[in-house]
Amino acid sequence: MSQSNAVSKQSEQLHKDVQEAFKSFQSVAPTALKTTDYSKVLTSTLAATQKSVKIQIAAGDLTLLKQSGYKLCFAKKVGNEAYNVVWQSYVQYLSNSTFSWTPQYQLFGANSFQANVQVDVSTNLVNIGLGQQSILDNAGLLGSATSGGPDTSITLVNNYGAIHPGLSQLSTGIDGKQISTPIYVASAQVVTGQTVLTPVETILVWFEQNVQTSTMFSTSRSQSIEIDLTFDNSATRLYSGGSWTVV
């Protein structure tokens, strides 16, 4: 599945979820809503749940980073696990760069976890949200998401066997483009049964050379900053003199 199709299907699924939510109120307000009404609710829902960070870089640091070939990198936390996938990496960052995301996910399985290698998705991708689950059948196919599991988590019901569960999430990059890319791959295989994945609204930001989006890693990132947006929707951080400060 191409990234553009993935984004389109995620938006379509969210639209359906909003429709289903409104159907539950039909007994109270039986008048059918128009497509434009659903679109308005969809837009407001996304706006209410969007998180964003603005990264400011001092002039001297920007010049040095660019001359040395450093990329601006982001990673997303899942559960209590260490960050282990480069969510996005950018070369064309400027003095002010904004990165944002919404809670639109895709579940997948991978056959391996290997540091310094890009994620290789082995199963099909399934659009899924918090409070939903997907069954990986004995043939290795993920079924459509259904309600199930903890409200703040995504649940994999594994009937297949040894697999590394993974999650992708939709983001809007510093270039304004929307794309869904991996945020997490379990470093250890899981066996049959249920595995609960809990995305956390905390991200890691750092600069690194010779790295690509979707690269897995198993060591801490130097000169990084962790930004917790659990109780906030936006934050700004300044990189100046080789260190980070809150703005």
Set out the residue ranges of the language-model regions:
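Intrinsically disordered, low-complexity segments enriched in small/polar residues
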Residues: 2-247
